[in-house]
Amino acid sequence: VNGNYSQSMSNWSSGTFISPADYDYKLNILYSNACGFDGSNPDKLVRIKNIGGNIQGGYLAMGTGTGTWYSHVKYSPLSPAGTSTLYLGTVSGRLFRITNAQATPAKTEITGDDFPVANLSSVAIGNSEDTLLVTFSNFGVVSVWKTFDGGVTWNSAEGNLPDIPVRWSLLHPSGARHALLATDLGIWTTDSLT
């Protein structure tokens, strides 16, 4: 109606109340958490291809061994041509890099040794996939972590941030030291990530 388009995939029952999802705009593929609060479809995403056309969808096994739902799904716009690289966070603080998600996914766990067992709320990607900023949305934990080597080493980037949940993060595309954080107390910014 009025130029809008919608299509339903019937008989699907998956995901959480607000399931994290992200869209690979280069390959026209939507990825979304498939695991429900009840544990159905563990360690899976929903992958929907050809949006706006003859859509094709299905469950996609990730092979991470995770029994909980994914709390964050992030598509990397820096994925090699013709491929989808995803970052998946869990409610238990684990982080995975998934390559080749458009076909047969390959996973690498890049969870930091000191990450809290907490809800991983966002992954921000800098001007390369070596530069990542990860946030957690729990009280009583270090909520902001950064890496400049693709997840081999992680360091706290919380600085003087109070003990508040961080919901989302953005890195400035031309300067990985500049970040915005969406928190329960508003938007915080820094230009001195190290």
For each of these PLM feature ranges, what is it?
Residues 16-17, 69, 82, 119, ...:
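Beta-rich catalytic cores
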Residues 10-13, 61-67, 112-115, 159-162:
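Surface loop/turn motifs at the tips and blade-to-blade linkers of beta-strand repeat domains
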